[in-house]
Amino acid sequence: MCRNITELRGLEPPATHEEIDAAAMQFVRKVSGITKPNAEVAALMHEAAHQIAHITADLLAQVPPRRQPPVTVPPLRRPEVRERMGLAPFPG
């Protein structure tokens, strides 16, 4: 649970809903300190992540563009991470 929160502003192509949702869930896990919730807590965490993702998407749509892209590639754009997670290749 020591991962850094992924920086999404300034990506080309822009951050996907999948990336925003993953970052929101990562944030919820980090601030709650819960990595393996029971069903009741999992539902609460998913609702919180959904709300955070919506707010984050609005924020990213409104902030001014960056002068330079982030220095690291977000995990969900790395082929080895997507393969490990069983996700399709990143479309870009």
Regions found by a protein language model. Give the residues of each.
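A charge-rich, low-complexity, intrinsically flexible signal that marks solvent-exposed coils, linkers
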Residues: 1-92
